[in-house]
């Protein structure tokens, strides 16, 4: 029964932690399937049109040259259809194989062989680190770690490298790469009600104002803002007011609109939409796992000012993680466990807690082990007491 519960808990942990591992390649497969369907439907309609034209021509006793020309057109369209179909199927097959490879990898966690299970845990840790490094912008380090660990097909490097290109273009104050990304994911972004493309068009308008190309800015507004409504319409009205002010104005809100820091806001907006598009959280799995682990073992003893109650074996008590865990909640413990300061053993009915006259509590077995001539020395205060002075503690 305990084994079944442990397996169920592990399965639930995998579902929570490994969701991005399967979701990202699945979304890529889904996207390629839809693109393939559109391409094949489009090319099929082209073939149907030229075949219909050929049939219409044949019904009126045409010249041989015109028939040959139409047949060449049919052959050309069929060749294009075949090429597009092969390319689409290959792309889908690659994504399907990647999904299968990751599923097989996740199944390895239930191996009965300790060595295989430990290897799988190491790979999972490496995968978490690679994703965290990619999120932090350490792309070269992440790629090297993935290559050395042999997990290149188990992490979402391609997605983050694509995002890197978009973010770098926005840092250069260019919008074309990000707009192309919006076009590639147009249907999904529309379902998400993303306003990233609108924000990019607003920024293009602002840059035209900055360059004093006001007629171009008006043409740009007519082309891209004619369908604006709701809150977007209010924003359009605001930026249109920039036409009446010089590009170096100090009047709000136009001064804020001309602030180059808006490009950093666009990067943050793209990053947010990119994570939503692939159904990823704002924090990496590594960060979430680390915070959950620290919170699970965090106690008030880890933050005593005198430092006397800190445990050298406790990660939260360590200098590097103590500050990191400070804003996290304390461990939830329905049933307290008393641990002896001397031996580290749990104090229970077989090792009852004993309180010395100075108020410090130790396990009975530990006091026996340090007793000399019926005397015990408190490890904390170095005070000496008779063994008989120790009193049993009862927890209500």
Curated annotation (Swiss-Prot):
Localization terms from the record: Cytoplasm; Nucleus, Nucleoplasm; Nucleus matrix; Cell membrane
Main location: cytoplasm
InterPro entries: CRA_dom, CTLH/CRA, CTLH_C, Fyv10_fam, LisH, ZF_RING_GID
Residues carrying the site annotation Essential for ubiquitin ligase activity: 314
Keyword presence, Nucleotide-binding: no
Zinc finger (RING-Gid-type) in chain: 314-381
First-tier enzyme category under EC: transferase
Sample GO molecular function, one term: ubiquitin protein ligase activity
E.C. numbers: 2.3.2.27
Entry remark concerning the domains of this protein: The expected RING-type zinc finger domain is highly divergent and most of the expected Cys residues are not conserved. Still, the protein is required for CTLH complex E3 ubiquitin-protein transferase activity. In addition, the conserved Cys-314 in this highly divergent region is required for ubiquitination by the yeast GID complex, suggesting a direct role in catalyzing ubiquitination.
Protein name in UniProt: E3 ubiquitin-protein transferase MAEA
